[in-house]
Swiss-Prot record:
A cellular-component GO term for this protein: cytoplasm
One GO BP: protein K69-linked ufmylation
Protein name: Ubiquitin-fold modifier-conjugating enzyme 1
Taxonomic source organism: Drosophila sechellia
MF GO annotations: UFM1 conjugating enzyme activity
UniProt entry keywords in alphabetical sequence: Ubl conjugation pathway
Active site: C116
Metal-binding as UniProt keyword: no
Amino acid sequence: MVDDSTRKTLSNIPLLQIRAGPREKDVWVQRLKEEYQALIKYVENNKQSGSDWFRLESNKEGTKWFGKCWYMHNLLKYEFEVEFDIPVTYPTTAPEIALPELDGKTAKMYRGGKICLTDHFKPLWARNVPKFGIAHAMALGLAPWLAVEIPDLIEKGIITYKEK
């Protein structure tokens, strides 16, 4: 189910230990520390391999995340706002990643611009609770979704390149 490239990417993202969500206030701080460490490592790895593709930050509580992601297609950079909330049942429930500006532009998306991850990602996440975190959701959820959907949306003329 997972190709060699994805397997290599995954093996370089630290696995998380602490099983805590936003409701467990004291332990959640420790889980957030693990989340940030894994995200930092993932971004560093991406930069070293020349595949840097997102920036994220969170609110003070670590329950709302937002930032930008981008996809390179034919040497043009397509940039999108990305956002998600950490579910109260996290890490049992994976975050639902949204690209609001693409809402309604593809069938592989739910209302509000939430990307469809049910078939491939959610079963994998469920088998790896609490080891997977936000970095894993980006690597196994958003990255493959962008790789499949963005070129298709570009070819259909649904999204176009915007000069900056």
